[in-house]
A protein has these predicted regions:
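Extracytoplasmic
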Residues: 40-74, 95, 181-182, 261-267
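Hydrophobic core of transmembrane alpha-helices in multi-pass small-molecule transporters
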Residues: 50, 118, 130-146, 253, ...
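Interfacial helix-cap and linker-helix signal at transmembrane-aqueous boundaries
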Residues: 66-67, 98-99, 180-192, 270-271, ...
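Cytoplasmic helix-loop-helix junction between adjacent transmembrane helices
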Residues: 135-172
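Helix-loop-helix hairpin linking two adjacent transmembrane segments in secondary transporters
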Residues: 169-220
Length: 431
């Protein structure tokens, strides 16, 4: 069994002798980690993540519309979202492998045009299953998937000292998309209909994502001999790389099954309570705007204490906020609880990427980060469908919230065990 250890990463810069990454192409001079170019690259990556993230949230906004359009139940109306998320997960892993081999530019040049095509095709569908398939293949797998896991992994290669905050910033694009797109879609659907809105999104994705993607042509040159050294890393973890990866995958699924209940169903939930879908869209935007703040804050915390402790903190706060949904369903209280939920859970998913970078070599970043982050997407997909199915069985969302809390407790147990295992190994080495 190979023991996973924390170690120095990258190759030394010649002029300073400081360990780090060197970024270059044959026609360009090397760029050290945390350079001004890396920060400009981060800005472009954030824009791509925000635009591409529309593929994750569009099906949430039109959930009540799909229910009425195709005559399906709440569980059936949740399936297009689930299909998009499953496609998103599969595509993330495949595109992550492609990025490891060819750089992020090739996946991005695939993503923009096909995401736009996916929205146009979805607008032209005439049956429920056509819509589900388009959501899964074009919107999820070939479109939006590139703008999450693979893009986060690419950004992690360009930073060392500020990796935590950099990863948090680009991962915030997913939540910025959730804060921006639902309100835009809700308004445009009310004016022109969902099909015309989808066509407009498709055109917008193509004309913005392609030029932004071209800004990321330059590749990072990395030395993949060892993992990154985390701020809190001071010893080995006595588990094989396969075991570490597997544990993180299960934990990511569990946390996001819990996370999906409010995110996927808050609009439908507000409709059931009589507040209307527009109020639900506002709550979703508030939740995800608070999530952006959470992601940035957790990135700063992780830069000081490491990914695992920050991950446990966020998971515990998410569980507590889910409990708050049970006794409170008034309009004002739902706004407050949704804001608390966003602040609690926003930083969880990016910390999985940081933990992966703490344990695995940079040359494996695209594949391994994408695998864990896409596992979180699978959790969102399962949880979104599961909550709808529980609603169909019980007629309310109370049992769905309890289901989310149970999955959240499983996540806390797994990550706590992983941290305790590392601490025990460190104590053994000290003796």
């Amino acid at each position: 069994m190979r023991v996973v250890r924390f170690g120095a990463e990258g190759i030394a810069t010649r002029h300073q002798g400081i360990p780090g990454l060197i970024m270059q192409t044959p026609s360009q001079s090397p760029q050290p980690a945390d350079s001004s170019y890396a920060w400009w690259r981060l800005v472009a990556s954030l824009a791509l993540s925000t635009i591409g993230g529309v593929g994750l949230w569009s099906a949430v906004v039109i959930l009540p519309t799909i229910e009425a359009e195709f005559g399906v139940g709440r569980g059936g109306a949740s399936l297009p979202y689930t299909a998009a998320m499953i496609g998103f997960a599969i595509g993330g892993v495949l595109m992550g492998k492609l990025a490891d081999r060819a750089g992020i530019i090739l996946p991005l040049m695939i993503s923009g045009p096909l995401l736009g095509l996916g929205f146009v095709l979805a607008a032209l569908t005439t049956s429920y299953w056509q819509f589900v398939i388009v959501q899964a293949v074009f919107v999820g797998m070939l479109g939006s998937s590139v703008t999450f896991g693979p893009l986060v992994a690419d950004v992690s290669l360009w930073f060392r000292r500020w990796r935590g905050i950099a990863v948090a910033i680009v991962a915030s694009g997913n939540y910025l998309a959730g804060a921006i797109w639902p309100s835009i879609l809700e308004r445009t659907i009310a004016v022109v209909g969902w099909r015309e809105s989808y066509m407009g999104i498709g055109v917008f994705c193509v004309v913005t994502m392609v030029p932004l993607g071209l800004l990321l042509r330059r590749r990072a040159v990395v030395d993949g001999t060892g993992p990154s050294k985390a701020p809190s890393a001071s010893g080995p973890l006595p588990l094989s790389p396969t075991h570490v990866q597997g544990v993180l995958v299960v934990a990511a699924i569990a946390c996001c099954v819990a996370m999906s209940m409010p995110q996927v169903h808050i609009i439908a939930y507000c409709g059931d309570l009589g507040y209307g879908p527009a109020i639900g869209a506002q709550m979703l935007s508030l939740m995800l705007a608070m999530g952006v703040i959470s992601r940035l804050g957790s990135g700063l915390i992780a830069d000081h204490i490491g990914g695992l402790p920050t991950l446990i903190l966020g998971s515990a706060l998410q569980c507590l906020s889910l409990v708050f949904y049970l006794p409170f369903n008034g309009l004002t209280s739902l706004y407050v609880v949704s804001a608390i939920f966003g602040l609690a859970q926003g930083g969880i998913v990016p910390n999985y990427a940081l933990v992966v970078r703490e344990y695995f070599p940079a040359r494996e970043a695209g594949t391994r980060v994408s695998l864990v982050l896409m596992s979180s997407v699978v959790g969102m997909a399962i949880g979104g469908w599961m909550s709808g199915a529980i609603y169909d069985l019980t007629g309310s969302y109370e049992a769905a919230f309890l289901n989310g809390i149970a999955w959240n407790l499983l996540n806390i147990a797994i990550v706590s065990w992983l941290l305790a295992t590392r601490l025990r190994a460190r104590e053994s080495l000290a003796q």
